[in-house]
Design a protein with these regions (language model features):
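N-terminal export and membrane-targeting signals
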Residues: 1-3, 21
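C-terminal region of N-terminal signal peptides and the immediate post-cleavage residues
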Residues: 8-22
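Conserved SGNH/GDSL esterase-like catalytic core that processes O-acyl groups on lipids
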Residues: 18-99, 119-122, 128-131
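Hydrophobic/aromatic beta-strand patches that form the interior of the parallel beta-sheet core
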Residues: 23-25, 111, 148-150
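Conserved beta-strand termini and adjacent loop/short-helix elements that scaffold enzyme active sites
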Residues: 50-52, 113, 150-155
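Alpha/beta-hydrolase-fold catalytic nucleophile elbow
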Residues: 78, 113-114
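A short helix->loop->beta-strand "cap" motif at the edges of active sites that frequently abuts
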Residues: 106-110
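Catalytic His-Asp segment of secreted/periplasmic serine-dependent ester chemistry enzymes
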Residues: 118-196
């Protein structure tokens, strides 16, 4: 009898437990993908999304501080594209991403969405600049077991290889279209689920 009560109590706790909070810090890619992210996460997670059009990594530090004050279980950072697009110092962008990560010492996992190296600006290729940020993200991943990479660049690259010349996941080489948003949201959900 006591064992049955414990099983029932455990089941009730499991059903009524709050969803783990996930802090999202992002730019316009996160703005346009927010509905798909919320759909993909369902009731498994409680997303706290702070995303601003055109924002660079360093400009999100105040929002990161506010998110950190809520002590989220996991963090998703999708920033750096505007640093690449607007010609910002990549050294500063990397330092700003480190500052954002440092705000979350208690997060179980920090998921960094890397940058699409196929972005262009008025026809000018931005791959080398985006690649520099992606290499820095890989180094962060190697240095901190909590950090992983949501490989948006690989998703876009594979799609472009299958559907040349520009692929089917973005309309402007930067922002994901509905198909791209769905794939990005699923990749984020997979990363959250794999946090161990």
């Amino acid at each position: 009898m006591a064992a049955a009560v414990l099983v029932i109590a455990g089941l009730v706790w499991w059903l009524l437990r709050p969803s783990p909070t996930v802090a999202f810090l992002g730019d316009s890619i996160s703005v346009v993908t927010s509905p798909e992210i919320k759909t993909a996460l369902g009731s498994d997670y409680s997303p706290d999304i702070a995303a601003v059009l055109g924002i660079q990594a360093g400009q999100m530090i105040p929002a990161g501080q506010r998110a950190a004050a809520k002590d989220p279980d996991q963090v998703v950072i999708e920033l750096g594209s505007n640093d690449v697009l607007h010609g910002a110092s990549l050294d500063n962008a990397q330092a700003d991403l480190l500052k954002l990560i440092a705000l979350f010492p208690n997060a179980r996992c920090i998921h960094m969405v890397n940058i699409n190296t196929h972005m262009t600006d008025n026809g000018n290729a931005l791959g080398p600049r985006a690649g520099t940020i992606n290499v820095a993200l890989s180094h962060l991943h190697a240095a901190d077991h909590r950090i992983d990479i949501v490989d948006w660049n690989q998703i876009v690259s594979a799609d472009i290889a299958a559907h040349p010349p520009g692929g089917t996941l973005t309309d402007d080489t930067v922002h994901p279209n509905p198909a791209g948003r769905t794939l990005l949201a699923r990749a984020i959900k997979t990363a959250l689920d794999d946090c161990g």
